[in-house]
């Protein structure tokens, strides 16, 4: 067993999450500097950040992948993951939150709660991740602490527990006042020096007392010990208040709120203290649940070095220098470099080659890793995102990670045969890294088609393919991933008979189809009575039905949300076989769908545009011209936030058009909302175009 440098109670696995441009990466860079992981502060605008190490990240000034690093603060070991804020890379947030224990949510003090803020908040809530919030950019013109608190309460339905208030605002922002003891903090200074302190100005005392009283009242509502003291009129000491804040934070009953400006080095040291004081260690979270691989019986593992080894692989990276890196979170036990582990997801033994603690793109080789750690390994050849690694003598299968289906695709063609080989290898590695990136080969057109979550997502992946894998290829325009559905009940028979000398082919099945609720998926029911069709033939027919639905019946797009019930059929003792019934199933579903009033579904995107007020009319006009549906128009100081739904097919080129109508002064974010029925005339055009291919 290994000797721990830091007890489990002093380990923090945290993610820095937020909307794009809220200051996540800048905050993380300050954390690395203050914890002495770096000796100078990286800058996004200069492309010198440690965490944004990919060429595309430096060029675009955004975070694309989630990056892990280790840091140390006040006797605590922090595993910090900086995640992307752009919705096209939401998969990175999803997989990070699955393996983290706590989150630091960064908000732009000017913009407040933005579209992707809501998305990452929902993701964190789904995984039950305790959070603290950092209202950043308090030095910017238009920053408003109280308004942002109100937006967190109203839009995110969170119970705010402000533990600081800003002293000054915009160009007069001096720092923040801690409401527990009214100590004020200014510049963070160097790692060795304590943060600058100053006395609470007289002009802010009444406001600070009011905020503190509100904080105590909210804390009392959620914590019995504070409530008893509050009702008795007693003043609890700071340490007891901090213990109560930790309890309500871990229980997700309230969210501690802090403020500052990462760029100007104010507030990050206190934020680091808060991570240690209020966010959970691995022992504070419930035991990880799983099942026995063979029996499916429920099992669990506690965060302990003495329990059997269990871990979840959450990220694959193709490193150009060392090869295939697998990131995993250890939930129990420990593991050594060179040791054997069991992949219970795939039923295969694997060997841990080199064991690595990552610092963004730098690697630190280690001999062993303990429960609660996030590390990477070389040598795991058959382990993929969402796989469980464990001790073979005590196997467990942990819940995997669920990812959304891609909604956009484009064709890509290599220019030479050697490019074909490089492209195949590159696409395979990129698909291993990103579960929302899919690759399919179209047999009819001979084209390779790639699928992703949005234009930027595919743009970045194509850029990586061309630059990292040196592929010379032609790239088509983005296309919409439509879906098919039915709107009525129908019944049809599929009968496949072929006689050409010798043994013939015979398969016969009758099915009924009916629509299901949107998102319910495909269901097959066997309702054939009296053994009219043997079980193995019926399963072959079902395989034919399923494959036909996957390739499309109406317009060549996958058909979803349909219930298929097999009701009758017949077979021949000599001529029937599984292939004949597979053909019969395919024929039956095609005939049934034709009668069931098929429709086309199109992906609808939720779009949020932030524009100066003078361009609001132009932005709304452009939005309406795209078959958009306005949900809300929210005026803010200096800007207006327009939220609505727009079909993905109408959103291509929106970046350029929005820049044009607002002279580059508006921003927007867009995420997948749902699939909805496409208007008849437009659907007919898509169906006709599919028929001409």
UniProtKB/Swiss-Prot annotation:
The keyword GTP-binding applies. Its main location: cytoplasm. GO terms for cellular component: cytoplasm. Signal peptide: none annotated. One of its GO terms (biological process) is ribosome disassembly. GTP binds at residues 18-25, 82-86, 136-139. Residues 9-283 form the tr-type G domain. It is found in: Cytoplasm. PROSITE patterns: G_TR_2. InterPro entries: EF-G-like_DII, EFG_II, EFG_III, EFG_III/V, EFG_IV, EFG_V, EFG_V-like, P-loop_NTPase. It holds the Pfam family EF-G_D2. Keywords: Cytoplasm, Elongation factor, GTP-binding, Nucleotide-binding, Protein biosynthesis. One of its GO terms (molecular function) is GTP binding. Catalyzes the GTP-dependent ribosomal translocation step during translation elongation. During this step, the ribosome changes from the pre-translocational (PRE) to the post-translocational (POST) state as the newly formed A-site-bound peptidyl-tRNA and P-site-bound deacylated tRNA move to the P and E sites, respectively. Catalyzes the coordinated movement of the two tRNA molecules, the mRNA and conformational changes in the ribosome. NCBIfam families: EF-G, PRK12740.1-3, PRK12740.1-5, small_GTP. Belongs to the TRAFAC class translation factor GTPase superfamily. Classic translation factor GTPase family. EF-G/EF-2 subfamily. This is Elongation factor G. It comes from Dehalococcoides mccartyi (strain ATCC BAA-2266 / KCTC 15142 / 195). The gene is fusA.
């Amino acid at each position: 067993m290994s000797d721990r440098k830091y007890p489990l109670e002093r380990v923090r696995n945290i993610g820095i999450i937020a909307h794009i441009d809220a200051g996540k990466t800048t905050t993380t860079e300050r954390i690395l500097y203050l914890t002495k992981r770096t000796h100078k502060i990286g800058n996004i605008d200069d492309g010198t950040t440690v965490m944004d190490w990919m060429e595309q990240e430096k060029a675009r000034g955004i975070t694309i992948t989630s990056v892990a690093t280790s840091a140390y603060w006040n006797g605590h070991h922090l595993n910090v993951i900086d995640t992307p804020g752009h919705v096209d890379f939401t998969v990175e947030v999803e997989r990070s939150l699955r393996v983290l224990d706590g989150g630091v949510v960064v908000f732009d003090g000017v913009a407040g709660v933005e579209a992707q803020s809501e998305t990452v908040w929902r993701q964190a809530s789904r995984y039950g991740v305790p959070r603290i919030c950092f209202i950043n950019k308090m030095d910017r013109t238009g920053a408003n602490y109280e308004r942002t608190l109100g937006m967190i309460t109203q839009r995110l339905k969170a119970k705010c527990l402000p533990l600081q208030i800003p002293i000054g605002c915009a160009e007069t922002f001096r720092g923040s006042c801690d409401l527990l003891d009214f100590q004020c903090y200014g510049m963070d200074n160097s790692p060795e020096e304590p943060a600058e302190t100053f006395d609470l100005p007289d002009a802010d005392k009444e406001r600070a007392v009011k905020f503190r009283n509100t904080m105590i009242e909210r804390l009392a509502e959620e914590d019995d010990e504070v409530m008893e003291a509050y009702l008795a009129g007693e003043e609890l000491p700071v340490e007891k208040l901090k213990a109560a804040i930790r309890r309500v934070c871990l229980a997700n009953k309230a969210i501690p709120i802090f403020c500052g400006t990462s760029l100007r080095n104010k507030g990050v040291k206190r934020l680091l203290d808060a991570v240690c004081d209020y966010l959970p260690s691995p022992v504070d979270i419930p035991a990880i649940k799983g099942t026995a691989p063979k029996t499916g019986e429920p099992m669990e593992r506690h965060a302990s070095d003495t329990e059997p080894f269990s871990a979840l692989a959450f990220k694959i990276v193709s490193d150009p220098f060392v090869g295939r890196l697998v990131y995993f979170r250890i939930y129990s036990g420990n593991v050594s470099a060179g040791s054997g582990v069991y992949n219970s997801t795939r039923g295969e033994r694997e060997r841990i080659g080199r064991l690595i603690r990552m610092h963004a793109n730098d690697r630190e080789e280690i001999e062993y890793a303990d429960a609660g750690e996030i590390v990477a390994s070389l040598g795991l050849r058959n382990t993929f995102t969402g796989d469980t690694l464990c001790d073979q003598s005590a196997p467990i299968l942990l819940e995997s990670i669920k990812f959304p289906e891609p909604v956009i695709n484009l064709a890509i063609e290599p220019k030479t045969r050697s490019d074909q080989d490089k492209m195949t290898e590159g696409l395979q590695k990129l698909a291993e890294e990103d579960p929302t990136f899919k690759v399919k080969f179209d047999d009819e057109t001979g084209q390779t088609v790639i699928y992703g979550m949005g234009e930027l997502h595919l743009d970045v992946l194509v850029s990586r393919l061309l630059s990292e894998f040196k592929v010379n290829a032609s790239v088509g325009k983005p296309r919409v991933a439509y879906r098919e559905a039915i709107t009525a009940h129908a019944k049809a028979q599929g009968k496949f008979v072929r006689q050409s000398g010798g043994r013939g082919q015979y398969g016969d099945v009758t099915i009924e189809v009916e629509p299901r609720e949107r998102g319910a998926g495909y269901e097959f029911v066997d309702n054939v009575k009296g053994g009219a069709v043997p079980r193995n033939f019926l399963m072959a027919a079902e395989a034919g039905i399923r494959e036909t639905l996957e390739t499309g019946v109406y317009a060549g797009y996958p058909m979803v949300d349909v219930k298929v019930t097999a009701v009758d059929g017949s077979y021949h003792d000599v001529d029937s076989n599984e292939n004949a019934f597979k053909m019969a199933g395919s024929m039956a579903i095609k005939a049934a769908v034709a009668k069931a009033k098929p429709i086309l579904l199109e992906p609808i995107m939720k779009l949020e545009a932030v524009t100066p007020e003078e361009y609001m009319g132009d932005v709304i006009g452009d939005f309406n011209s795209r078959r958009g549906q306005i949900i809300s128009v929210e005026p803010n100081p200096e800007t207006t936030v327009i939220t609505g739904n727009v079909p993905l097919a109408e959103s291509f080129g929106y970046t350029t058009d929005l820049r044009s109508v607002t002279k580059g002064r508006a921003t927007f974010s867009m995420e997948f909302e749902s699939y909805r029925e496409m208007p008849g005339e437009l659907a007919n055009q898509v169906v006709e175009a599919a028929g001409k291919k």
